[in-house]
């Protein structure tokens, strides 16, 4: 019943593009809006993203690349953060990776191969925008996988900052990934079949050992991790955090005890997304407003376009 109500509310939020002449895009802090968008407009770019004519400004010189997580896609993941960033003056780009083109279920393939896909996409963004580097914001696997690109594929020269929302930096468990699969249409089938990225994200995998050998970070980029203590996918939740210089680790409940968001809903959590804005523009950072945020659905904001 709760999901049905949320979907009904989300119908009015989902717009594939902004109306002609609109100054801002709506920002639906509701995970149901993402599922609805992916159902009605599968494979579509998140609102405001992938404008290849966008040019970065002096205030925001780095385009932002959004990287979704396991079993997800760019459409269901970024219906809130993409328009929020565009409304705040950023050039925003998003991709699907790690799955068959047109498949709703993405990010199940070999993670180093996905990192190479990210690298090719970053090169395209840099060439189109004329920027020297990008900022990367990722969720779950999408917050961890760019670290492979940064460490092994030259991303230390092209990434200015990596912001991870509940990233699987040090792995997860079988039960954690199974619960994540249930959150996305088609996820359980993919989890029950061939999901190389799932195996690579299990705690103690050879992939994670290689990724984290010699330290969590490399010189050059800055790193921000935003996590919720109610994460039941990345467990313990503190395993999302990184150690090293130029690292900021944020636990949402340290800012707001009323934030009850979980692993899935964090990408539609107004408090978490405000923290993303702060990470990308620390000089203009402001404290997020503390308000009730629900598990799974997210929330905590209004449809204000900011």
What are these regions (language model features)?
Residues 1-88, 291-306:
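Flexible, membrane-associating and regulatory peripheral segments of lipid-active enzymes
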Residues 56-60, 85-87, 128-129, 137-138, ...:
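Extracellular/periplasmic catalytic domains that process cell-envelope and extracellular macromolecules
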Residues 62, 66, 76, 80, ...:
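Extracytoplasmic/secreted proteins, especially bacterial periplasmic and envelope-associated proteins
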Residues 67-68, 92, 112-212:
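Serine-dependent carboxylesterase/thioesterase catalytic core
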Residues 69-72, 103-109, 196-198, 260-266:
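Second-shell loop/turn segments in exported
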Residues 71, 99-101, 169:
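Alpha/beta-hydrolase active-site loop signature
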Residues 84-102:
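Conserved alpha/beta-hydrolase
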Residues 218-306:
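C-terminal catalytic-base region of ester-bond hydrolases, centering on the histidine
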